[in-house]
Design a protein with these regions (language model features):
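N-terminal secretory signal peptides that target proteins for export/translocation
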Residues: 1-8
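Bacterial N-terminal signal peptides
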Residues: 11-22
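Boundary at the C-terminal end of the N-terminal hydrophobic targeting segment
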Residues: 25-29
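Extracellular ligand-binding/catalytic regions of CAZymes and related secreted enzymes
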Residues: 30-39, 65-68, 83-86, 196-207, ...
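Helical hinge/lid and interdomain linker segments adjacent to catalytic or ligand-binding clefts
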Residues: 30-34, 41-43, 47-126
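Short, solvent-exposed loop/turn segments at secondary-structure junctions
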Residues: 48, 98, 125-126, 193-196, ...
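Catalytic beta-strand/loop cores that center a nucleophilic Ser/Cys/Thr
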Residues: 63-64, 144-216
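A glycine-rich, often tryptophan-bearing local segment used as a flexible ligand/cofactor-contacting loop or short
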Residues: 98-167
Length: 264
Protein backbone atom coordinates (compact mmCIF):
# COMPACT_ATOMS: atom_id res chain seq x y z
CA UNK A 1 0.00 0.00 0.00
CA UNK A 2 1.35 3.40 -0.97
CA UNK A 3 1.26 6.23 1.51
CA UNK A 4 -0.25 9.39 0.08
CA UNK A 5 1.80 12.53 0.72
CA UNK A 6 0.26 15.17 2.94
CA UNK A 7 -1.30 18.06 1.09
CA UNK A 8 0.12 21.54 1.66
CA UNK A 9 -3.09 22.56 3.43
CA UNK A 10 -2.93 19.55 5.79
CA UNK A 11 0.72 20.23 6.56
CA UNK A 12 0.01 23.88 7.34
CA UNK A 13 -2.89 22.93 9.61
CA UNK A 14 -0.74 20.40 11.50
CA UNK A 15 2.04 22.94 11.99
CA UNK A 16 -0.47 25.53 13.18
CA UNK A 17 -1.94 23.05 15.66
CA UNK A 18 1.40 22.17 17.24
CA UNK A 19 2.43 25.83 17.37
CA UNK A 20 -0.85 26.65 19.10
CA UNK A 21 -0.33 23.90 21.69
CA UNK A 22 3.25 25.03 22.29
CA UNK A 23 2.30 28.70 22.60
CA UNK A 24 -0.61 27.83 24.91
CA UNK A 25 1.67 25.88 27.26
CA UNK A 26 4.21 28.70 27.21
CA UNK A 27 1.59 31.37 27.89
CA UNK A 28 0.10 29.46 30.80
CA UNK A 29 3.55 28.80 32.25
CA UNK A 30 4.06 32.57 32.41
CA UNK A 31 0.94 32.82 34.60
CA UNK A 32 2.52 30.55 37.23
CA UNK A 33 5.29 31.23 39.76
CA UNK A 34 8.86 30.66 38.61
CA UNK A 35 10.95 27.89 40.15
CA UNK A 36 14.13 29.93 39.80
CA UNK A 37 15.91 30.10 43.14
CA UNK A 38 13.18 28.15 44.93
CA UNK A 39 14.43 25.63 47.48
CA UNK A 40 12.77 22.29 46.74
CA UNK A 41 12.83 19.15 48.87
CA UNK A 42 12.21 16.08 46.68
CA UNK A 43 11.47 13.07 48.89
CA UNK A 44 11.06 9.63 47.30
CA UNK A 45 10.75 6.03 48.41
CA UNK A 46 8.10 3.67 49.70
CA UNK A 47 6.50 1.03 47.49
CA UNK A 48 8.68 0.31 44.45
CA UNK A 49 5.69 -0.46 42.23
CA UNK A 50 5.09 3.27 41.76
CA UNK A 51 8.63 3.64 40.39
CA UNK A 52 9.80 6.48 42.64
CA UNK A 53 13.37 6.48 41.31
CA UNK A 54 12.21 6.59 37.70
CA UNK A 55 9.84 9.46 38.46
CA UNK A 56 12.66 11.38 40.11
CA UNK A 57 14.61 10.81 36.90
CA UNK A 58 11.86 12.62 34.99
CA UNK A 59 11.40 15.54 37.38
CA UNK A 60 14.90 16.29 38.63
CA UNK A 61 16.43 17.44 35.30
CA UNK A 62 13.40 19.65 34.66
CA UNK A 63 13.48 21.19 38.14
CA UNK A 64 17.16 22.04 37.75
CA UNK A 65 16.61 23.43 34.25
CA UNK A 66 13.91 25.68 35.74
CA UNK A 67 16.46 27.05 38.20
CA UNK A 68 15.23 25.33 41.36
CA UNK A 69 17.68 24.46 44.13
CA UNK A 70 16.83 20.81 44.77
CA UNK A 71 17.66 18.49 47.65
CA UNK A 72 16.75 14.83 47.09
CA UNK A 73 16.28 12.33 49.90
CA UNK A 74 15.23 8.66 49.83
CA UNK A 75 14.13 8.94 53.46
CA UNK A 76 11.61 10.96 55.46
CA UNK A 77 14.29 12.09 57.93
CA UNK A 78 14.43 15.73 56.67
CA UNK A 79 10.83 16.25 57.81
CA UNK A 80 11.98 16.06 61.44
CA UNK A 81 14.59 18.81 61.01
CA UNK A 82 12.64 21.93 61.95
CA UNK A 83 15.29 24.46 60.95
CA UNK A 84 15.79 22.80 57.58
CA UNK A 85 12.05 22.57 56.89
CA UNK A 86 11.67 26.29 57.65
CA UNK A 87 14.02 26.99 54.73
CA UNK A 88 12.05 24.94 52.19
CA UNK A 89 9.77 26.58 49.61
CA UNK A 90 8.30 23.37 48.22
CA UNK A 91 8.06 19.69 49.13
CA UNK A 92 7.57 17.17 46.32
CA UNK A 93 6.80 13.73 47.70
CA UNK A 94 6.46 10.23 46.24
CA UNK A 95 6.40 7.80 49.17
CA UNK A 96 3.61 5.24 48.77
CA UNK A 97 2.32 2.96 51.55
CA UNK A 98 4.85 3.91 54.18
CA UNK A 99 5.14 4.76 57.85
CA UNK A 100 5.95 8.21 59.16
CA UNK A 101 7.01 8.95 62.73
CA UNK A 102 5.13 11.43 64.88
CA UNK A 103 8.12 13.77 64.77
CA UNK A 104 8.38 13.57 60.98
CA UNK A 105 4.66 14.13 60.47
CA UNK A 106 4.67 17.11 62.82
CA UNK A 107 7.65 18.62 60.98
CA UNK A 108 6.03 18.21 57.56
CA UNK A 109 2.61 19.50 58.58
CA UNK A 110 4.07 22.44 60.47
CA UNK A 111 6.14 23.45 57.44
CA UNK A 112 3.08 23.39 55.18
CA UNK A 113 0.88 25.23 57.68
CA UNK A 114 3.57 27.92 57.93
CA UNK A 115 3.67 28.48 54.17
CA UNK A 116 5.72 25.88 52.34
CA UNK A 117 3.97 24.30 49.36
CA UNK A 118 3.58 20.60 48.71
CA UNK A 119 2.92 18.77 45.44
CA UNK A 120 2.59 15.13 44.55
CA UNK A 121 0.77 12.51 42.56
CA UNK A 122 -0.94 9.14 42.67
CA UNK A 123 -0.11 7.01 45.73
CA UNK A 124 3.09 8.89 46.44
CA UNK A 125 1.05 11.65 48.05
CA UNK A 126 -2.51 10.28 48.07
CA UNK A 127 -1.75 6.86 49.60
CA UNK A 128 1.38 7.48 51.62
CA UNK A 129 0.59 7.22 55.32
CA UNK A 130 -2.68 5.35 55.77
CA UNK A 131 -2.77 5.63 59.55
CA UNK A 132 -2.23 9.40 59.64
CA UNK A 133 -5.53 11.22 59.28
CA UNK A 134 -4.11 14.71 59.87
CA UNK A 135 -1.78 14.10 56.93
CA UNK A 136 -4.80 13.09 54.82
CA UNK A 137 -6.58 16.25 55.98
CA UNK A 138 -3.65 18.20 54.57
CA UNK A 139 -3.63 16.37 51.22
CA UNK A 140 -7.40 16.59 50.76
CA UNK A 141 -7.98 12.97 49.83
CA UNK A 142 -6.98 9.33 50.26
CA UNK A 143 -6.92 6.45 47.76
CA UNK A 144 -9.34 3.61 48.47
CA UNK A 145 -9.67 1.61 45.20
CA UNK A 146 -8.78 1.36 41.52
CA UNK A 147 -11.56 -0.78 39.99
CA UNK A 148 -10.31 -2.96 37.16
CA UNK A 149 -6.64 -2.21 37.74
CA UNK A 150 -4.97 -0.96 34.55
CA UNK A 151 -7.76 0.21 32.24
CA UNK A 152 -8.56 2.80 29.59
CA UNK A 153 -10.34 5.90 30.83
CA UNK A 154 -10.75 9.59 30.07
CA UNK A 155 -9.75 12.64 32.08
CA UNK A 156 -12.03 15.66 31.71
CA UNK A 157 -10.52 19.10 32.26
CA UNK A 158 -13.28 20.86 34.20
CA UNK A 159 -11.58 24.15 35.07
CA UNK A 160 -10.67 25.95 31.86
CA UNK A 161 -9.53 29.15 33.60
CA UNK A 162 -7.10 27.96 36.27
CA UNK A 163 -3.49 28.33 35.05
CA UNK A 164 -2.75 24.71 35.98
CA UNK A 165 -5.23 23.39 33.39
CA UNK A 166 -5.92 26.36 31.13
CA UNK A 167 -5.59 25.53 27.44
CA UNK A 168 -5.51 21.76 27.96
CA UNK A 169 -8.00 19.45 26.26
CA UNK A 170 -9.54 16.29 27.70
CA UNK A 171 -7.28 13.28 27.32
CA UNK A 172 -7.17 9.50 27.67
CA UNK A 173 -5.13 7.36 30.04
CA UNK A 174 -4.26 3.65 30.18
CA UNK A 175 -3.52 3.25 33.85
CA UNK A 176 -5.17 2.96 37.25
CA UNK A 177 -8.34 5.00 37.58
CA UNK A 178 -8.18 6.06 41.21
CA UNK A 179 -11.30 6.02 43.37
CA UNK A 180 -10.66 8.27 46.37
CA UNK A 181 -12.21 9.67 49.50
CA UNK A 182 -11.97 13.40 48.81
CA UNK A 183 -12.51 16.57 50.82
CA UNK A 184 -15.63 18.05 49.15
CA UNK A 185 -14.18 21.55 49.46
CA UNK A 186 -11.05 21.13 47.30
CA UNK A 187 -10.81 23.15 44.10
CA UNK A 188 -11.25 20.50 41.41
CA UNK A 189 -9.45 21.06 38.11
CA UNK A 190 -10.06 17.73 36.34
CA UNK A 191 -12.29 14.69 36.84
CA UNK A 192 -12.96 11.19 35.56
CA UNK A 193 -16.16 9.12 35.29
CA UNK A 194 -16.54 5.38 35.91
CA UNK A 195 -18.09 3.03 33.37
CA UNK A 196 -19.39 0.59 35.98
CA UNK A 197 -17.76 -2.32 34.13
CA UNK A 198 -15.51 -3.19 37.07
CA UNK A 199 -17.79 -2.06 39.91
CA UNK A 200 -21.40 -1.78 38.75
CA UNK A 201 -22.56 0.31 41.71
CA UNK A 202 -20.35 3.27 40.73
CA UNK A 203 -21.48 3.50 37.09
CA UNK A 204 -21.62 7.17 36.15
CA UNK A 205 -19.88 8.33 39.32
CA UNK A 206 -17.52 11.28 38.87
CA UNK A 207 -14.25 11.58 40.79
CA UNK A 208 -11.73 14.42 41.08
CA UNK A 209 -8.41 13.63 39.40
CA UNK A 210 -6.59 16.94 39.90
CA UNK A 211 -7.13 19.41 42.71
CA UNK A 212 -5.59 22.26 44.67
CA UNK A 213 -6.19 23.56 48.18
CA UNK A 214 -4.38 25.09 51.11
CA UNK A 215 -3.40 23.77 54.53
CA UNK A 216 -2.80 26.68 56.83
CA UNK A 217 -0.74 29.06 54.68
CA UNK A 218 0.65 26.33 52.43
CA UNK A 219 -0.46 25.48 48.90
CA UNK A 220 -1.29 21.83 48.25
CA UNK A 221 -1.43 20.33 44.73
CA UNK A 222 -2.46 16.77 43.90
CA UNK A 223 -3.00 14.69 40.76
CA UNK A 224 -4.00 11.03 40.89
CA UNK A 225 -2.26 10.36 37.56
CA UNK A 226 1.14 8.68 37.48
CA UNK A 227 0.90 5.02 38.54
CA UNK A 228 4.22 4.43 36.80
CA UNK A 229 6.72 6.76 35.19
CA UNK A 230 5.52 5.89 31.67
CA UNK A 231 2.15 7.48 32.46
CA UNK A 232 3.89 10.83 32.12
CA UNK A 233 4.48 10.05 28.45
CA UNK A 234 0.94 11.43 28.11
CA UNK A 235 1.75 15.12 27.50
CA UNK A 236 -1.21 16.50 29.42
CA UNK A 237 -0.47 14.37 32.47
CA UNK A 238 3.11 15.65 32.65
CA UNK A 239 2.12 19.24 31.88
CA UNK A 240 -0.46 19.27 34.67
CA UNK A 241 2.10 17.95 37.15
CA UNK A 242 4.70 20.53 36.13
CA UNK A 243 2.20 23.38 36.37
CA UNK A 244 0.95 22.13 39.72
CA UNK A 245 4.51 22.06 41.03
CA UNK A 246 5.07 25.62 39.90
CA UNK A 247 1.81 26.78 41.47
CA UNK A 248 2.71 25.14 44.78
CA UNK A 249 6.20 26.63 44.74
CA UNK A 250 4.73 30.13 44.99
CA UNK A 251 3.13 29.36 48.34
CA UNK A 252 5.32 31.71 50.41
CA UNK A 253 5.32 34.48 47.82
CA UNK A 254 1.87 34.62 46.22
CA UNK A 255 -1.50 35.74 47.64
CA UNK A 256 -3.70 33.08 49.20
CA UNK A 257 -6.28 31.79 46.72
CA UNK A 258 -9.94 31.25 47.55
CA UNK A 259 -10.41 27.52 47.12
CA UNK A 260 -13.24 26.44 49.43
CA UNK A 261 -16.36 25.81 47.36
CA UNK A 262 -18.83 23.65 49.29
CA UNK A 263 -20.78 21.21 47.14
CA UNK A 264 -23.50 20.51 49.69
Amino acid sequence: MKTRPLSLRTSVLMIAFFLTVSMSASTNAEDLPSLKGKKVLLVYGGWKGHEPEQCVGILLPWLKAEGAVVDTFSTLAPYADQKYMESIDLVIQIFTMSKITAEQEKGLLTAIRNGAGIAGWHGGLGDAFRENTEYQFMVGGQWVAHPGGIIDYEVTVTDKKDPVTKGLANFKMHSEQYYMHVDPNVKVLATTAYSGKHASWIEGATMPVVWKKTYGKGRVFYTSLGHVAADFNVPQALEILKRGIRWSAGSKYEPTEQWVKPVY
